[in-house]
Amino acid sequence: MKIQGLKLTQFKNYDSGQFVFSERLNCFVGKNGMGKTNLLDAIYYLCMCKSHRGVNDRNVVKHSTEFFRLEGYFLNEKKIEKKSKSKIKIVAKVQPGKNKEIEKDDVAYQKLSEHIGMIPVVIIVPDDTLMATEGSEERRRFLDNTLSQLDGDYLKNLITYNKILKQRNSALKKFAETRSFNAELVDI
């Protein structure tokens, strides 16, 4: 899968932008703060339904604006299914008061997890050196993101695991506050 084009609207430091990519090699050159990493983050967002920095969607909307929209065009070189198209359009929209929406060829996904792995992507940025020097949390997040793209069952199990972990931690917090378990907490 190769990216062919990208349109950004009110994403991070971009009011709007339109990019056409070479099939071979693309280089982004500019001074600090010009948006090179934000451009890469937009591509990542279209593939993973989130920013690579793990921030809330509100934090990727351009300052003092209400929404953002990303539109990416990809070339599917491995037409796995006979009916699959060679060109794919992915749109990501975040608007106030609405759920995030990801569309493939103008059809919205019911669950964002259905999209993960459609366009495999790995991003490595200078801060990722922390994976080697800091704790295991960053390494685990990197591996989870990568493996989730390769194996849909892994992603489903990861979502379930994180949900159960959140419930367990909430139950332990309630227990610490009340010093008692009730039937609801025991089920968790």
Predicted regions and their residues:
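Pre-Walker A-like glycine/lysine-rich segment at the N-terminus of P-loop NTPase domains
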Residues: M1-Y45
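Nucleotide-state sensing region of NTPase/ATPase domains
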Residues: M48-T133, E137-E138, L147-Y154
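Alpha-helical structural signal
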Residues: K36, L40, D57, L143-D144
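Alpha-helical initiation/capping and key positions within long helical/coiled-coil segments
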Residues: V20, N38, N59-K62, K156, ...
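Generic alpha-helical structural context detector
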Residues: D41-Y45, P120, D144
